[in-house]
Amino acid sequence: MTQFNIPVTMSSSLSIILVILVSLRTALSELCNPQDKQALLQIKKDLGNPTTLSSWLPTTDCCNRTWLGVLCDTDTQTYRVNNLDLSGHNLPKPYPIPSSLANLPYLNFLYIGGINNLVGPIPPAIAKLTQLHYLYITHTNVSGAIPDFLSQIKTLVTLDFSYNALSGTLPPSISSLPNLVGITFDGNRISGAIPDSYGSFSKLFTSMTISRNRLTGKIPPTFANLNLAFVDLSRNMLQGDASVLFGSDKNTQKIHLAKNSLDFDLEKVGLSKNLNGLDLRNNRIYGTLPQGLTQLKFLHSLNVSFNNLCGEIPQGGNLQRFDVSAYANNKCLCGSPLPACT
């Protein structure tokens, strides 16, 4: 039988061609946009190549769900990276938020959280993410002020900057965002007054959490225009009247104003029938408890302790289900579950 001996040089050439063909086939079958992949690899580098991002490999497809925290748009089959979760990474040393995030122009959702070694301000590059709906930067050491340039991202629905090292004052400009539904800025070092413009958020806006900061001054009268389902301004240094947050014509479910220096007549406020949580402890609130509290069938959380309230606790509804601690240390509040009035 005749045997054919392929020369070594030809064999090597065939091997090289085979490798090229395999690589070409892989490249052609890859769904990940090459610009998105390059941006992700740069983000990884900018964060010091943490071991938790070891799945981000240049030889694999970033849209095959093996890249930790990366999702691509499969609905429209554009396969652009539209969802990025950068949470819980152990950075080898302090790094800022990568400006290379701006090179992911189709991002809809960005979560950056639980990274102690993430420092510095929120970079202006974020403003280039013009399709961003949900922005979360939480539980980091990111510092500086909440930037005005966020108002350029008209698509924003949710802003959550909770538990960072942010300081400065609240940016008035974000109230112009037409699609914003809620802000969560609790657990920072934000100071100064709440801007009057925060009473002019769109009708879509229903949630405001700015607790555990250093806010001063009064709650703007413009807040009467808001219809908030949830508001938490607790643990600040706010003063004056908070009655603008209440109203029988509103859909308010929770109001948390504890540990401020608020001073208003509680008896005169209107109550939303949907109210299920009310925390007013440690203020200077006076008057009597409104009779309307007995009509709130969803009320399951109440604390009005450490105020200047007087009179008898109304009987009925859920009011007697709360223990003494919910009513304690007022000026002259009495009746069940407190001692009887005399």
From Swiss-Prot:
GO BP annotations listed: defense response
Organism annotation: Phaseolus vulgaris (Kidney bean)
SUPFAM superfamilies: L domain-like
Glycosylation site list: N64, N141, N303
InterPro entries, alphabetized: Leu-rich_rpt, LRR_dom_sf, LRR_N_plant-typ, PGIP
Location in or out of the cell: Secreted, Cell wall; Membrane
Cysteines paired by S-S bonds: C32-C62, C63-C72, C310-C332, C334-C341
Topology within the bilayer: Peripheral membrane protein
Extent of the LRR repeats: 82-107, 108-132, 133-156, 157-180, 181-205, 206-228, 229-252, 253-275, 276-299, 300-319
Entry GO CC: extracellular region; membrane
Signal peptide positions (record): 1-29
Protein name: Polygalacturonase inhibitor 3
Recorded family membership: Belongs to the polygalacturonase-inhibiting protein family.
Expression (tissue specificity): Found in suspension-cultured cells and to a lesser extent in hypocotyls, leaves and flowers.
Keywords, alphabetical: Cell wall, Disulfide bond, Glycoprotein, Leucine-rich repeat, Membrane, Plant defense, Repeat, Secreted, Signal
Function according to Swiss-Prot or TrEMBL: Inhibitor of fungal polygalacturonase. It is an important factor for plant resistance to phytopathogenic fungi.
